[in-house]
């Protein structure tokens, strides 16, 4: 029987765009209006089915605050997928997307990295970024694109399933399996990450 595969997915983007809410909605089907900002990196394990196959995603939720950005850079290594997130009600978070893509270019170490652009908070009425703008940006950068709402659940499951589908379509990603890790955890940014530890080490 073929072993299940585990793939590392990193959520990046400005602070307060809803990265943690997206992860919690996907992994636990919960939503909290009063979530605190992520300090450092937190991760969750979640299984999805793609074409009848079980795919284990190790989802890393990163801090978006500027003071943590340099410390987070090392966590790009080994990622199979990137979810670049912005808030459709905050133009600045969309304008900063190129900064985050530069971070990916500088620190990610896979040439076949799958990138998904996600516009979050479409449940709100005060939209500042149109769907067309998001789709056009993603097209120019060769990214997948979806809009979603962690609050109303719209697009959340689809986003991760589409990303997982693209990841496993890459032959190099399915040639060997990664050891399964525990289901949740966090990493302090004060410390240099130890990549020999059993923390979702895909």
From Swiss-Prot:
Region (Disordered): 171-202
Keyword annotations of the record: GTP-binding, Hydrolase, Lipoprotein, Methylation, Nucleotide-binding, Prenylation, Protein transport, Transport
Residues where Cysteine methyl ester is found: 202
Catalyzed reactions: GTP + H2O = GDP + phosphate + H(+)
Molecular function GO labels: GTP binding; GTPase activity
PROSITE patterns: RAB
Annotated Polar residues bias: 171-186
EC number: 3.6.5.2
Enzyme class, broadest EC rank: hydrolase
InterPro entries to which the protein is assigned, alphabetical: P-loop_NTPase, Rab, Small_GTP-bd, Small_GTPase
Pfam families: Ras
Lipid moiety-binding residues (S-geranylgeranyl cysteine): 200, 202
Amino-acid positions noted as binding GTP in the UniProt annotation, renumbered to this chain: 15, 18-21, 32, 38, 64, 121, 123, 150
GO biological process entries: intracellular protein transport; lipid droplet organization
Motif (Effector region): 35-43
GO cellular component, one term: lipid droplet
Domain of life: Eukaryota
Signal sequence, start to end: none
Family statement: Belongs to the small GTPase superfamily. Rab family.
Function, in words: The small GTPases Rab are key regulators of intracellular membrane trafficking, from the formation of transport vesicles to their fusion with membranes. Rabs cycle between an inactive GDP-bound form and an active GTP-bound form that is able to recruit to membranes different sets of downstream effectors directly responsible for vesicle formation, movement, tethering and fusion. Plays a role in apical endocytosis/recycling. May be implicated in transport between the plasma membrane and early endosomes.
Name of the protein: Ras-related protein Rab-18
Lineage: Eukaryota, Amoebozoa, Evosea, Eumycetozoa, Dictyostelia
Protein's gene: rab18
